[in-house]
Amino acid sequence: MAASSHAIAPTDAELLQAQADLWRHSLYYLTSMALKCAVELHIPTAIHNLGGATTLPDLVTALSLPKTKLPFLGRIMRLLVTSGIFASDGANGDGAAAEAVYRLNPLSWLLVEGVESEDHTYQKYFVLATVSQHYVDAGLSLADWFRKDLPEPLPSPFECLHGVPLAHESTKLLDEELDRIVEEGVAAHDNLAIGTIIRECSDIFSGLHSLTYCCGRQGNISATAIIKAFPDIKCTVLNLPRVIETAPADDAVSSVTGDLFHTIPPAQAVMLKLVLHFWSDEDCVKILEQCRKAIPSREEGGKVIIIEILLGPYMGPIMYEAQLLMDMLMMVNTRGRQRTENDWRQIFTKAGFSDYKIVKKIGARGVIEVYP
């Protein structure tokens, strides 16, 4: 039986608003392209080098762009200011961009190269990866992917289109530059906010004598930050051979080659920071089963520390939309997904854990302790 229909009779104002909303949703990709342009032109770094604020003519000069491009750069900057990527004094909608003073804000600060700050992780490669041709093509193939009757385990649209999974050894065979950008982008993304986590969730490390940090791209950055704050912790970084071979040397941690699915070096705690969202629920259970084998009982302080996006509208609609977009990024390009608290609870139970605690919600992410 067909569902009962409710006739929609929009007013004139609603129709015009609907058309404007359709424009926005259909053309949002141009905001991403404008951001990519700004990153490739090194606009955030140029503004930083000019003292953190600049006019459009000075920016054109600093970037060594033809003066004929000034009005076009003004239009790009106007969009990026409106989108919250830069701040501006004096910019308005009447085209008077040349009189505006453009400034960095917290978002564009993350795109400045060479900032000396423990809390700064250069995010250029995250941007370049997510708007790369291979990612975009995978997104454009979504409808075709839905129509195909594919055998399980289902390949991602990226894998279905390009023939290789993302962030895998075979990705390099598809495109070496893509592989490099993805590795750099994931590393930058994963290591951002480790200082915030250490400051706001220090209790998760207090009393630990050993920690296995699992499979972060260039995971030594986060692991080293933890050891610096808690020097009594003996930290082992578990990673794939190809990652360890290219990672910078670090005397503060011990690096071990291995595989999450087979064995994890024993420790009082195992830490998985932005790892599990790459994997299916079934694979997450297998990984967590290995984690459970690697730690002692809860009475002896055994636990798994998980830092992942925790899907939910608890931080408001803008942060929730960002979480959902990250979930779409996973759906299009990997076999993984972002998860709600209920999703995590079911996975923890299947992996044989007795309890868990959400220590804190930090931005889009949750810090979770899971107990054997």
Curated annotation (Swiss-Prot):
<dbReference type="GO" id="GO:0008757">
    <property type="term" value="F:S-adenosylmethionine-dependent methyltransferase activity"/>
</dbReference>
<dbReference type="InterPro" id="IPR001077">
    <property type="entry name" value="O_MeTrfase_dom"/>
</dbReference>
<feature type="binding site">
    <location>
        <position position="259"/>
    </location>
    <ligand>
        <name>S-adenosyl-L-methionine</name>
    </ligand>
</feature>
<dbReference type="GO" id="GO:0046983">
    <property type="term" value="F:protein dimerization activity"/>
</dbReference>
<comment type="function">
    <text>O-methyltransferase of unknown substrate specificity. Not active on resorcinol, orcinol, guaiacol, eugenol, ferulic acid, p-coumaric acid, catechol, caffeic acid or monomethyl ethers of resorcinol or orcinol.</text>
</comment>
<feature type="binding site">
    <location>
        <position position="273"/>
    </location>
    <ligand>
        <name>S-adenosyl-L-methionine</name>
    </ligand>
</feature>
<dbReference type="GO" id="GO:0009058">
    <property type="term" value="P:biosynthetic process"/>
</dbReference>
<comment type="subunit">
    <text>Homodimer.</text>
</comment>
<keyword id="KW-0808">Transferase</keyword>
<dbReference type="Pfam" id="PF08100">
    <property type="entry name" value="Dimerisation"/>
</dbReference>
<protein>
    <recommendedName>
        <fullName>Probable O-methyltransferase 2</fullName>
        <ecNumber>2.1.1.-</ecNumber>
    </recommendedName>
</protein>
<dbReference type="InterPro" id="IPR029063">
    <property type="entry name" value="SAM-dependent_MTases_sf"/>
</dbReference>
<dbReference type="GO" id="GO:0008171">
    <property type="term" value="F:O-methyltransferase activity"/>
</dbReference>
<keyword id="KW-0489">Methyltransferase</keyword>
<dbReference type="InterPro" id="IPR036388">
    <property type="entry name" value="WH-like_DNA-bd_sf"/>
</dbReference>
<feature type="binding site">
    <location>
        <position position="216"/>
    </location>
    <ligand>
        <name>S-adenosyl-L-methionine</name>
    </ligand>
</feature>
<dbReference type="InterPro" id="IPR012967">
    <property type="entry name" value="Plant_O-MeTrfase_dimerisation"/>
</dbReference>
<dbReference type="Pfam" id="PF00891">
    <property type="entry name" value="Methyltransf_2"/>
</dbReference>
<comment type="similarity">
    <text>Belongs to the class I-like SAM-binding methyltransferase superfamily. Cation-independent O-methyltransferase family. COMT subfamily.</text>
</comment>
<dbReference type="InterPro" id="IPR016461">
    <property type="entry name" value="COMT-like"/>
</dbReference>
<keyword id="KW-0949">S-adenosyl-L-methionine</keyword>
<feature type="active site" description="Proton acceptor">
    <location>
        <position position="277"/>
    </location>
</feature>
<dbReference type="GO" id="GO:0032259">
    <property type="term" value="P:methylation"/>
</dbReference>
<dbReference type="InterPro" id="IPR036390">
    <property type="entry name" value="WH_DNA-bd_sf"/>
</dbReference>
